[in-house]
Amino acid sequence: MTGLAIRNISMRFDLPNGGSVQALQDVSLDIKQGEIMSVLGPSGCGKTTLLNIVAGFLAPTDGVIELNGHEVHGPNAERGMVFQKGALFEWMSVRENVSFGPRMKGERASDYSANVDHLLDVVGLQDFKEKAIYELSGGMQQRVALARCLANDPDVILMDEPLGALDALTREKMQSLVLKLWKETGKTIILITHSVEEALLLGERLIVMAPRPGRIHKEYRLPFADEGVDADLREVKKNPKFAEVREEILGMIWDMEEEIMGRTEASA
């Protein structure tokens, strides 16, 4: 399989006053199958817009998305989405949520049950499978969301700030789980985050986007995701290279934010 191709994507939103906003301009990326890539940038750089175009929720103004050599039109089961809030069915049990996709596709329970149980084991929720969603903590709910996404067996997993609302310790545990699932499943993962450290930990490839219009500013190839599969993430962060790249990116984004503020003040 050839993976995911983002070809010259531009996105313009028309405004009620007759004007428009250029959210993305000529974004191109080739993402190989099994790659984990993080996308980072200041607010307004088009990160989520790009993810929604890849998911098929938005049609770009220009450009195309191709998955395994076929042009993407609208959402389908080949691309799974995990949101900041799990978008789970609170009245259903954990197991019912995880098995929702296969059930909606008309699969027989005998065909999907073993995989659902395996996924519940992987995310550490087998003992909670009969619990209702509202009985779970935020971190546990995000584990359910991950398992539900994987139960549909997508080629690509799209994650829009899925760990942003979690406390620091739970977030670190979830970061380790994401890396474990990446290695175990071989899925392509694209993760949007506002956290520089998270982007470094969860991206063997890291894309920094610049705003107005949203575009690729810089790309990094990093060893930390591979290291984090087997190592304690706190130890990974002690790598001098980790600190060096973190400071470089923080400075880069700071400068972008300063430029945005300058533009805003000049137009006021």
Swiss-Prot record:
Record keywords, A-Z: ATP-binding, Cell inner membrane, Cell membrane, Membrane, Nucleotide-binding, Translocase, Transport
InterPro entries: AAA+_ATPase, ABC_transporter-like_ATP-bd, ABC_transporter-like_CS, ABC_transporter_ATP-bind, P-loop_NTPase
CDD domains on file: ABC_NrtD_SsuB_transporters
Signal peptide: none
Subcellular location: Cell inner membrane
Main location: membrane
Chain ranges passing through the membrane: none
Main enzyme class: translocase
Record's catalysed reaction(s): taurine(out) + ATP + H2O = taurine(in) + ADP + phosphate + H(+)
Recorded GO MF terms: ABC-type taurine transporter transporter activity; ATP binding; ATP hydrolysis activity
ABC transporter domain sequence ranges: 4-236
GO cellular component: plasma membrane
Membrane topology reported for the UniProt record: Peripheral membrane protein
PANTHER family hit by this protein: TAURINE IMPORT ATP-BINDING PROTEIN TAUB, TAURINE IMPORT ATP-BINDING PROTEIN-RELATED
Family according to the record: Belongs to the ABC transporter superfamily. Taurine importer (TC 3.A.1.17.1) family.
Described purpose of this protein according to its UniProt entry: Part of the ABC transporter complex TauABC involved in taurine import. Responsible for energy coupling to the transport system.
Subunit structure: The complex is composed of two ATP-binding proteins (TauB), two transmembrane proteins (TauC) and a solute-binding protein (TauA).
Name by which UniProt lists this protein: Taurine import ATP-binding protein TauB
Lineage, uppermost ranks: Bacteria, Pseudomonadati, Pseudomonadota, Alphaproteobacteria, Rhodobacterales
